[in-house]
Amino acid sequence: MTNIIMFFALAIYAQTVPCAYIIDNSGTPTNVRNAPSGKVVQKIPLTDGGYVVTLLEVKNKWWKIAPSIDIYGEEDDATLELKGSHTGYWIHYSVLQFGIAGDPENVLRATPSEKGKPLQLEISLLHDGLHPLEIRGEWIKVETNDKRHTGWMPIDRICSNPLTTCP
């Protein structure tokens, strides 16, 4: 019975709290700040693997993230614990990405609803990764990598694995 309850709790958590991986093409460590556009409190080092963060809230394209960051692709998967802020940890949306789990066709909508008009985009744009912009209920607004298209997708269709695709 405990396993069923735990699974149910995790399923709800996964649908309402999205995750994203860090893709910072600057060639330098990624800054984590104490507020949107605030003081840098930690730098996330470059790695051969990837980092996955939990997105908590957004303010002016800055995402507040959970203080535990999952590290993938190293010899052993590990966790990086952020330190140095009493006001939370913030990272800019432009270095956060995720993919689409399953078939990407008709996933993006003009409005945050299954009844919203499906957006017809080239599949290659959807495979290049999406940047998170805002959350409304169980929907997340995203921007394509080329910054030319935005749309809404269900949070449960997020693939936040930086090393593989999600079924």
Give the predicted meaning of each segment:
Residues 24-62, 99-137:
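Beta-loop motif signature
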Residues 9-14:
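N-terminal signal peptide c-region/cleavage motif recognized by signal peptidases
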Residues 7-8, 98:
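Phenylalanine-focused residue identity feature
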Residues 15-19, 37, 66-115, 143-167:
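Boundary regions of SH3-family modules and the immediately adjacent low-complexity/disordered segments
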Residues 1-7:
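Sec-dependent signal peptide recognition
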Residues 5, 16-18, 49-51:
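Residue-level detector of functional hotspots within protein domains
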Residues 140:
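Surface-exposed aromatic
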